[in-house]
Each structure stands twice: as structure tokens, then as C-alpha cells.
């Protein structure tokens, strides 16, 4: 029985409700009165139910599609302006006991070189990331109780936060590790993590169990209920996502939105972020073995509808996607991207030898962080290295309240400009610096609150003189 407030996986992600929704969408997708009513609701920035969103996904009218794309861009700018948050993944270890058939880290893969970073190696990786200009990391590790216990993760977080190299500092560590206990989530909270991220992979229980034949991850309920335990452990900000291509896209699209609705209904705050990775090639993984690949046109539509259905959430796209695709996705609601990424263990300090194969997936966007920042500036996006909300305690429902009532721009715009200024001063190429300085000068006047605008101008001058780490 479907119950969005239940904490039982098969009740808040109810297979019969998903299938009923898919049937409803197929039946009513050509009802233009209904479709335009749904678009009007989205245009009022009220979000959409999973059933309403499914109707839009199923509707193949070109004019409706164009309205969806235009509206996604409008919604993104309403809540997040033209800011794009920058981050990088940091892979600590690829030791893993699970048998996920779509991931090269699976325990039976003998061709991959297993690696685990020591604390000194983590220090070197973090310095390399700081020297690029990064301030926000997404920490990644395989699931292995002996090689990657929670104590190793906690020690690594402490190490990362402790490193201050030149003007560099990692100010927010997000964590993407396997589902764990309420007590361990409390320990992660106490370690000062930002967002806890866990991808569902697929919401189809039968398919999930087939794709995860061995290891602790094979337990569908344990994995699917992880965000509930994280919330119960005091983690305010959680990030969800599916790996599109493992299941029919319509099924996982509906399941993903139901998960967001469940968190909002049960805890009063929905997902801080939604990620939309697509299955891609990796060592010992051939995408031809999976029949549910999502073509670009459908993928773009999925991203756009998620944006209008869950308008408050941050939406993330990684270097799995090419520069060309990422440019299109920025127009459809994406608000966070990675740049200069390495998906191998230890890949920031030393370029991996071809025979090592320690990467989780092959990246499609190989540009440096400076090239990505320059590209964003050329597209009139603000590359933001801001971590202020997390550090000021604006998390969970406090962040969402500010976001939904439109007050966040008095914080986010000046913070974005100040962190961009830091990047330009410390790390940017001359061409990027010139573009960025022109943007800061132009956009400072857009800070809505006069006092905040004056204070931001003062802080920008002080950054020019060598001071760092101002925030609203």
C-alpha cells in the first residue's frame, strides 16, 4: 500500500503506485487541458506531484516540450539565479565487497587495481585540489568493512578539513558512501559533513536485486531507507539520484520523485540535491549489456521536468557528460557541476597508468577547472565556490525556507561573487581573470539588499588586498 509518510521502503516507493502512475501518464498525456494545467502549476513555482510530472514526461507534443525547457530555465533562475556551484570528487578507495554488475569496483573484478589512500596521500590529493581552486569536495569510497570502515572515512574527513595550503581550504566535504546505521550517520554529522549523498541506482526492487547479487548492498530495504536513517541521525542535507540506464527511464523517474516527496512528507524537507548520472563505460562494464540506455533527447526532458517538479533542489551533473551536453543541461535546470575531475584513486597527484584501471567510470569532459570556469563565464553563469550556508547553519529546513521565500539571493549572490573573486585572485589564468572581474563589477549591483550590497563591495575590496573567507 502506497504511503509517502511510511519509513518502509516498499510503502513509500510502492511498485503498484509507480506502475499505476505510468499507466495514468500514458492515458492522459494527450489531454491538453490537463497538460497545460500542470504547466500552469509549475509556472507558479509550486512544484509537481510524481503523477503530474509523469504526464509531462509522456507527452510528446513538441510545443509542450519547448514550454517545459523554457520553464525549467525560468525556475532555475528563480531559485538559484545564474549561479553554478563547483565541486570535485575525491576517490579514497576502490576496495568493495559488493557485486554491482554495472560498477567496475565489484568484488569479482580482477582486472582493476585496488587502491586505498593513506592520510598522507589524501593530504597530497587535497593540496592538488586546493591548488586548482576547489573549495568543495564529494568524498567517494567503495563499501568494504575492513578496508574502508567508518573510522577511516571519519579520519579522512578530519584530514581534509585540516589542510590549509597557501590560500586554499576545503570548506565543505560532501560524502557519498554506502548505506550505514543511524549511529554512523550521527558520527558523520558530528564530523562536519555537508550533504550525505547516496544514489538509489534503480527503484525497481526486482531489478535492483538482480543488479546487486552479492554483498550488503543487495538488501533493497537497507539501501532505500538510508536517507531516513541519515535524517534520523541528524543529517539535514541529503542528496538522492538514480543511475539512468539500469531500468526503464519512466519507472525510475517516477520513483525518484516519490522519494523526494517521501522526504518532504516525513521530515519536512526534501532532498538538498538530485543527481542525474547516466550509465557509462568503465573497466569490466560494457554499456551494450544494458538495454535501457537513455538517449539525449529523453535525458534532457527528464532533467527539465525534475527541475520544475522539485524547484528547490540543487541539481548535479558530473563529467560523465560531455562539454556539449553539459552546456545544454545548464539551460535546463542544472545548478552544480564538477570540474577538473579525476575518478581514479589518487588521480589528482599522479596521472593513472593505463594498466591501473582504478577509475569508477570514464569521464567525458576532460577540461581543467580553469577551462570550465572560463567556459561558464562565457555563458554568463557565475562559477560559485560558496559553502557559506553549510558553515552558517543554513541547512535542512532553514535553507529551504530561505530558498522558497526568495531571501536566499541576499546571501547567495554576494557569496558567489566573493568566492569567484578569491578564485580569480589565487588560481585563474589571465584570460579567465579578466572575464570574471568584469562579471563581478557588472553583477554586484544586482544584490537586492542595499546593506548587503555595500558590505559585499567592502569584502571584495578586502579580498583584492589579500584577505580571504568572507561570507554572508
How would you describe each model-predicted region?
Residues 107-124, 128-231, 236-240, 244-246, ...:
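Core AdoMet radical
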Residues 211-217, 288-292, 358:
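Short glycine-enriched, charge-decorated loop/helix-capping segments at active-site entrances
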Residues 88, 126, 154-161, 185, ...:
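Generic structural signal for well-ordered alpha-helices
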Residues 80-121:
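Canonical Radical SAM [4Fe-4S] cluster-binding loop centered on the CxxxCxxC motif
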Residues 141, 195, 221-285, 295-324, ...:
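Conserved C-terminal portion of the radical SAM core fold
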Amino acid at each position: 500500500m502506497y504511503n509517502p509518510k511510511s519509513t518502509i521502503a516498499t510503502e513509500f516507493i510502492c511498485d503498484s503506485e509507480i506502475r499505476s502512475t505510468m499507466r495514468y501518464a500514458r492515458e492522459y498525456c494527450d489531454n491538453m487541458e490537463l497538460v497545460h494545467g500542470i504547466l500552469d502549476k509549475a509556472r507558479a513555482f509550486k512544484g509537481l506531484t510524481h503523477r503530474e510530472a509523469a504526464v509531462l514526461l509522456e507527452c510528446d507534443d513538441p510545443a509542450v516540450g519547448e514550454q517545459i525547457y523554457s520553464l525549467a530555465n525560468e525556475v532555475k533562475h528563480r531559485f538559484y539565479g545564474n549561479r553554478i556551484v563547483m565541486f570535485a570528487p575525491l576517490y579514497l578507495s576502490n576496495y568493495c565487497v559488493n557485486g554491482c554488475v554495472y560498477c567496475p569496483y565489484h568484488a569479482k573484478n580482477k582486472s582493476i587495481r585496488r587502491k586505498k589512500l593513506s592520510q598522507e596521500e589524501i593530504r597530497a590529493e587535497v593540496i592538488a585540489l586546493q591548488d586548482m581552486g576547489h573549495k568543495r569536495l564529494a568524498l567517494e569510497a567503495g563499501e568494504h568493512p575492513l578496508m574502508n570502515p567508518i573510522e577511516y572515512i571519519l579520519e579522512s574527513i578530519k584530514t581534509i578539513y585540516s589542510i590549509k595550503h597557501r590560500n586554499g581550504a576545503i570548506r565543505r566535504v560532501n560524502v557519498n558512501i554506502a548505506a550505514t546505521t543511524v549511529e554512523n550517520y550521527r558520527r558523520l554529522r558530528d564530523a562536519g559533513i555537508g550533504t550525505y549523498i547516496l544514489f538509489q541506482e534503480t527503484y525497481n526492487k526486482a531489478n535492483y536485486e538482480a543488479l546487486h547479487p552479492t554483498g550488503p548492498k543487495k538488501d533493497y530495504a537497507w539501501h532505500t531507507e538510508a536517507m531516513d536513517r541519515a535524517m534520523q541521525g541528524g543529517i539535514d542535507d541529503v542528496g538522492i539520484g538514480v543511475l539512468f540506464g539500469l531500468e526503464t527511464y519512466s519507472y525510475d523517474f517516477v520513483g525518484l520523485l516519490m522519494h523526494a516527496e517521501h522526504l518532504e512528507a516525513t521530515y519536512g524537507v526534501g532532498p538538498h540535491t538530485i543527481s542525474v548520472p547516466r550509465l557509462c563505460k568503465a573497466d569490466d562494464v560494457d554499456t551494450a549489456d544494458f538495454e535501457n540506455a537513455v538517449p539525449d533527447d529523453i535525458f534532457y526532458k527528464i532533467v527539465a521536468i525534475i527541475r520544475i517538479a522539485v524547484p528547490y533542489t540543487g541539481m548535479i551533473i558530473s563529467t560523465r557528460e560531455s562539454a556539449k551536453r553539459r552546456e545544454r543541461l545548464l539551460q535546463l535546470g542544472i545548478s552544480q557541476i564538477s570540474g577538473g575531475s579525476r575518478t581514479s584513486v589518487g588521480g589528482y597527484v599522479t596521472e593513472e597508468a593505463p594498466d591501473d584501471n582504478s577509475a569508477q567510470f570514464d569521464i567525458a569532459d576532460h577540461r581543467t577547472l580553469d577551462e570550465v570556469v572560463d567556459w561558464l563565464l562565457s555563458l554568463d553563469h557565475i562559477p560559485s565556490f560558496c559553502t557559506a550556508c553549510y558553515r552558517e547553519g543554513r541547512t535542512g529546513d532553514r535553507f529551504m525556507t530561505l530558498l522558497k521565500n526568495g531571501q536566499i539571493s541576499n546571501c547567495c549572490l554576494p557569496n558567489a561573487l566573493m568566492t569567484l573573486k578569491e578564485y580569480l585572485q589565487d588560481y585563474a589564468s589571465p584570460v579567465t581573470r579578466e572575464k570574471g572581474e568584469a562579471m563581478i563589477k557588472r553583477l554586484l549591483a544586482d544584490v537586492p539588499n542595499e546593506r548587503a550590497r555595500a558590505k559585499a563591495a567592502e569584502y571584495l575590496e578586502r579580498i583584492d588586498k589579500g584577505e580571504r573567507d568572507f561570507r554572508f
